[in-house]
Every structure is written in structure tokens, then in C-alpha cells.
């Protein structure tokens, strides 16, 4: 019979996800139904992503928010515009505070991104379009780019 020593788990560094939620969701389908008949070509997608981190009142608790906006156009129409603010509440347990910025800007967004991606795909499909499947995002590269821009 095996036993689990829970005392060591209390001191192991780890990230705990306390909640995930939609803060704001908006979908505009301004040219429907005309735009739905003109789906013979692949639309141009303009995508923007931003990450906001908020230190919450409880020690080592943070809200990490993904702000994703996508606008789809073809030659004739603005097909749709979707904006999503999706967030998670994270507790960084037994982690050196010097590591918090990279964890909150890279690892935490990577943990909640698949859920935000699914919401966007479902909403665009429900609007009558092919589901918008956002490619995986390299949050590490975004973080390092932002840090290098901040230093200059």
C-alpha cells in the first residue's frame, strides 16, 4: 500500500488556478445575411492580442486577462468582429517573486488560451461562418519582445 506525503506538497512550488471566466464577449455580424452568401473565398483576418495582469488583494493571487480581437473581411464586406476578454485567477504558491512576471506573462496565459480559443471558434461558427481557429501563440516570444521593447 502506498502513502502520499502531503507535507511536501505544501512546500512544492506550483501554480493553482482558482477560476476561469469570460469578462466580456462581443460579436458583430454587420453585413449578415449578405455576407454569409459571399463565403466562397477565405477572408482576411486581423488579429490582436494583449495580456493584462492584476495583482489581487490576497497575497500571491493574480488575475491574468487575455484580450483577443479578430476582424474578418473579404473584398466586399466586414464579415465579423469578435472581442473576448477571458481571465483566470492564479495563485503562485512557494514561487520566488522574481519568477512571477514570466509565469504571469507566459505560463498562465498559455494555460487559459485554449479555452479562449474554443469560445472564439464556437461564437464565429454560431454566427454562420467557419469556426475561427486561432493558431497557437508563443507567449514566451511575446514576453521577450515586450521586455526588449521596454528596455529600449
UniProtKB/Swiss-Prot annotation:
One of the proteins required for the normal export of preproteins out of the cell cytoplasm. It is a molecular chaperone that binds to a subset of precursor proteins, maintaining them in a translocation-competent state. It also specifically binds to its receptor SecA. GO terms for cellular component: cytoplasm. Homotetramer, a dimer of dimers. One homotetramer interacts with 1 SecA dimer. Belongs to the SecB family. PANTHER family: PROTEIN-EXPORT PROTEIN SECB, PTHR36918. Gene3D superfamilies: SecB-like (3.10.420.10). Coiled coil: none annotated. Its main location: cytoplasm. It comes from Rickettsia massiliae (strain Mtu5). The gene is secB. This is Protein-export protein SecB. Keywords: Chaperone, Cytoplasm, Protein transport, Translocation, Transport. The keyword Cell cycle does not apply. HAMAP family: SecB. GO terms for molecular function: unfolded protein binding. The keyword Ribonucleoprotein does not apply. Disulfide bonds: none annotated. It holds the Pfam family SecB. One of its GO terms (biological process) is protein transport. It is found in: Cytoplasm.
Amino acid at each position: 500500500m502506498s502513502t502520499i506525503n502531503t507535507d511536501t506538497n505544501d512546500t512544492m512550488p506550483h501554480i493553482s488556478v482558482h477560476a476561469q471566466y469570460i469578462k466580456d464577449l462581443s460579436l458583430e455580424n454587420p453585413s449578415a445575411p449578405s455576407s454569409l452568401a459571399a463565403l466562397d473565398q477565405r477572408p482576411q483576418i486581423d488579429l490582436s492580442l494583449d495580456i493584462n495582469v492584476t495583482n489581487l488583494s490576497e497575497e500571491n493571487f493574480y488575475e491574468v486577462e487575455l484580450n483577443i480581437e479578430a476582424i474578418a473581411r473579404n473584398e466586399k464586406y466586414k464579415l465579423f468582429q469578435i472581442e473576448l476578454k477571458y481571465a483566470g485567477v492564479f495563485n503562485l504558491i512557494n514561487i520566488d517573486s522574481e519568477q512571477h512576471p514570466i509565469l504571469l506573462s507566459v505560463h498562465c496565459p498559455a494555460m487559459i488560451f485554449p479555452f479562449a480559443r474554443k469560445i472564439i471558434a464556437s461564437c464565429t461558427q454560431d454566427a454562420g461562418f467557419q469556426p475561427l481557429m486561432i493558431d497557437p501563440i508563443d507567449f514566451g516570444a511575446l514576453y521577450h519582445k515586450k521586455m526588449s521593447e521596454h528596455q529600449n
